[in-house]
From Swiss-Prot:
Binding partners and assembly: Part of the 50S ribosomal subunit; part of the 5S rRNA/L5/L18/L25 subcomplex. Contacts the 5S and 23S rRNAs.
Coiled coil: none
UniProt-recorded name of the protein: Large ribosomal subunit protein uL18
Naturally occurring in which organism (per UniProt): Baumannia cicadellinicola subsp. Homalodisca coagulata
Domain of life where this protein originates: Bacteria
Physiological role: This is one of the proteins that bind and probably mediate the attachment of the 5S RNA into the large ribosomal subunit, where it forms part of the central protuberance.
């Protein structure tokens, strides 16, 4: 099993366990990081933030590092709190809780999102 298939298998397992809760889903690429808050039953995206957005990207020198992940974490938490979402389950999509994924999660917690 290669690295990508193993990550996707872990991600599917996590999604199955969290299917009845509001999820904060993280996806990362070499250049960008994406975060979405997804509704529990119908899998609709309620809130999204990423380094692709001009408002976030213009404040950053590089969109693929920890500073960018912190900016996305703060923005997604601010948007969630504005819509009345305070508690979510963290879905790291099979990625290790390390580096950019960890930075995004800690920034969201600092703003006030609970998970």
């Amino acid at each position: 099993m290669d690295k990508k298939k193993a990550r996707l298998r872990r991600a599917a397992s996590t999604r199955h366990k969290l299917q009845n809760s509001t999820r904060l889903v993280v996806h990362r690429t070499i250049r960008h990081i994406y975060a979405q808050i997804i509704a529990p039953h119908n899998s609709k995206v309620l809130i999204a933030a990423s380094t692709v957005e001009k408002m976030i990207a213009n404040q950053l020198k590089n969109t693929g590092n920890k500073e960018a992940a912190v900016a996305v974490g703060k923005k997604i938490a601010e948007r969630a709190l504005a819509q009345g979402i305070y508690n979510v389950s963290f879905d790291r999509s099979g990625y290790q809780y390390h580096g950019r994924v960890q930075a995004l999660a800690e920034a969201a917690r600092e703003v006030g999102l609970n998970f």
